Amino acid sequence: NIAGDNFYQTEDDFRAATAPLYNKVWFDFNDKFYYGLGDGRGFNLCATTSNYIYPFADLTETGLTGPLVSAWGSLYNIVQQTNKIINGIKGNSSNSEEVKNPYIAEARFMRGVAYSYLAMLWGNVIINEDTDELVANPIVNTSPVSDVYEFAMRDLEFAAKYLPEVSSAAGRVNKYSAFGMLSRVYLTYAGYSSNPNSATRNQDYLDLAKKAALKVIENRNFELMTDYADLFMIDKNNNSETLFALQWVSNGTYGECNTIQDYFACESAITGNDRAWGGYVFAQPDVIWEYEKGDKRRQPTWMAYGDHYPEIQKANGGYTCEKKASGTVSGIYCKKYVCGSSKDNAKITSGSTPINTYMLRLAEVYLIYAEAILGNNPSTDDADAMEYFNKVRKRAGLEPQNSITYEDIRRERRLELCLEGQYWYDLVRRAYYKQQEVL
């Protein structure tokens, strides 16, 4: 009989134990919350009837709002699963620390990411490293948000030290995934203090964010994809820009597959079935107005009238977004994570696409690096900051800038990472030290 006390015997066991950390435990986070909160509450998305978006977009969610409850459960599922893995591998005496540490680091990476989300979303939460202990003594005090961030950073620092230089398999994280995630968490924590209107950030953590981002930038195994649209093609999963992505199973069962297309696709002509519930999910005008003329990111992100997509309805020469019948609600629809039907790609089935969900991309690390250099200054023309900020703009087909402000970085992050569940957290990060501005 396989049990927790006899499973963790070989490196193959360690590898098998960490595999579900890339999909199953994240499913309830990914299914509706990833974009519902990150983009709905961030005012990128609006929805008149979709109860997984409009409570966030309308700022009417409660502690019982479905996706919020699901996300809480998902994040603590990650914590408890990683605890079992970490303690199970540690308890193995037949393998060396050299063999065990990379798998412990993989689990601690996931736990660190989960706690970084818990800190930004709920603030004071329970920190737990032993699932059995929590079951035996379930009444536990929450820890201050500063301690939660510190815990997340310690996990990610361990991961950066012990994860392999190169991923052990496609889609698995490596030490640069950890450095990239550390750069985000350091940048966030730099602004946190007891005064939400301090208007300044901790320079030590800004420096740490810069150093962690530079570790990733200097690794030549990572580079921006040439074509922004390619980032969201199934056959481009685990590309040169991916630092951490959820890995969904082709033709997978519920809980192991990516369901986002169901909620984003605007009509069944795209999916080839009735699972196309995005006909009333639209871009907020506010985000569309932010795009500069010629920005190549708009069409791969949002579907507007007349936009053509050759990868959808391939047999018919592609799909063109057209206006709906008179009298129906229309708008600019979601395109990211919308991949088509099984006729377009045999890996797609009803309610299931295997496209990865991005959790961290190289482009974001470039923008983190630029923001860390900007720091507390009103603007910067620092050569390094401008080089990496403009790399992101160049791919988007936009003219380079000679200097940047926080507002430039805010807008660039919003458009680069739109529908990737990040913009609300950008606003929270800013509100840690400039709350009135964000309000």
Regions found by a protein language model. Give the residues of each.
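An aromatic- and glycine-enriched ligand-binding surface/loop that stacks and positions planar moieties
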Residues: 1-52, 86, 125, 149, ...
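Short coil/turn linking the two alpha-helices of tandem helical-hairpin repeats
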Residues: 119-121, 126, 167, 188-197, ...
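C-terminal substrate/ligand-recognition segments
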Residues: 300-392
